[in-house]
């Protein structure tokens, strides 16, 4: 008996030279795989942060979990009400609807592979974030697209206390 194997999407290979890179060293975001390339299964980016630099402010995703794999350095991560420090080789998974944020730990840079699942078409979100960083877009523009990119900004006292000490 033979089975028919029909893939949901074509296998994806993203070559370094073909990767869209946002930001400027040492603070960059490499756009690796958006939801449209994986039939909505996942989205993948790689973020590099300079010593003690902030990454994402406190936010949550209604429909997706987010995984952080620290490739190098040390990363502070808000996961709910707790701030943990993850080191190279550590993995942290944040469930949907859980407030989270991340930054390079004080005195350290961080290189992080981030996977969100199910995937959300978010490359345009990161491009907007880059335009805000360069002063080419208003930070309020991010508030206007929270629903579209399932990135909902909130406050976090534990995160503010932790980062104020940096």
Listing of model-derived features with the role each one plays in the protein:
Residues 15, 81-99:
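Short acidic-glycine-tyrosine-enriched beta hairpin
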Residues 63-75, 80:
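Glycine- and acidic-residue-biased ligand/ion/polar-headgroup-sensing regions
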Residues 61, 75, 124, 132, ...:
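Hydrophobic small-molecule pocket/channel-lining residues, especially in calycin-type beta-barrels
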Residues 111, 122-136:
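A hydrophobic, small-residue-rich beta->alpha segment in the mid-to-C-terminal subdomain
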Residues 50-53, 89, 97, 107:
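Tight coil/turn sites that cap or link beta-strands
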Residues 1-43, 135-166:
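A short, N-terminal "cap"/entry segment at the start of jelly-roll beta-barrel domains
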Residues 30-32, 45-61:
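Conserved short histidine dyad/triad with adjacent acidic residue
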Residues 96-123:
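Ligand-binding loop in jelly-roll beta-barrel domains
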């Amino acid at each position: 008996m033979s089975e028919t194997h029909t893939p949901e999407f074509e296998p994806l290979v993203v070559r370094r030279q073909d990767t869209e890179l946002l930001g400027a060293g040492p603070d960059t975001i490499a756009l690796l795989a958006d939801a449209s390339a994986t039939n909505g299964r996942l989205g993948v980016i790689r973020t590099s942060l300079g010593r003690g630099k902030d990454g994402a402010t406190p936010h949550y995703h209604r429909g997706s979990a987010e995984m952080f794999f620290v490739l190098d350095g040390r990363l502070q991560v808000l996961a709910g009400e707790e701030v943990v420090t993850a080191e190279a080789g550590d993995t942290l998974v944040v469930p949907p609807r859980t407030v989270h944020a991340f930054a390079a730990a004080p005195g350290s840079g961080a290189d992080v592979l981030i996977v969100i699942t199910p995937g959300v078409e978010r490359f345009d979100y990161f491009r907007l974030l880059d335009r805000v960083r360069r002063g080419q877009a208003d930070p309020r523009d991010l508030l206007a697209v929270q629903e579209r990119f399932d990135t909902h900004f909130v406050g976090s006292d534990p995160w503010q206390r932790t980062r104020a000490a940096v």
